[in-house]
Amino acid sequence: LQSLRLSGLVVSQGNISGMFEPLSGLTSLDVSNWTISDSPNLSGTFAPLSSLSSLNASSWDVSGATSLGGLFSGCAKIESLDLSGWDVSRVCDFSSMFAGDAALASLDLSSWDMESARDLSSMFSGCESLESLDLSGWALSKAENTSAMFSACESLTSPNLSAWRVSGTTNLSELFQGYVASSTPDFSNWVI
């Protein structure tokens, strides 16, 4: 099975974590117009769909989610995702959300309300093709763990992190491990 169309699916108060795990050979997946607003745990939903190159989840209502950990982890062939309209205001766990998405080239998450975010460890780890990442609107006042968040992001140009409030963050270890860009991120407003 290489292509699957599941548009219009209604998931009511369910856990769809790891839902597609047995279908690792999928290259195309239509999950448009899903109703998942009552699903708190979306962790690992698309992991590890390493052959998947096409995915449209832009219309998802994730306002009821508290965990997006590993959601797209290991989707190594996906080059772009439009998640700009997502309401992630209740999400605490973003760990490894895009980890290992080696072909992902750009991502605009600037409109995300990150006030509830606690764990962002390895969120973009291994996104080696990621050049453009807009996180400019983020305020991370409750974030506790950002370890290895940008680890092995070899192509990333200077992300705008100037608005981040990291005074409550207890783990910043290896935040930029493997970061080789010529420009330095702006930490001028950070209070640690």
Task: Cite the ranges covered by each PLM segment.
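Negatively charged
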Residues: 1-192
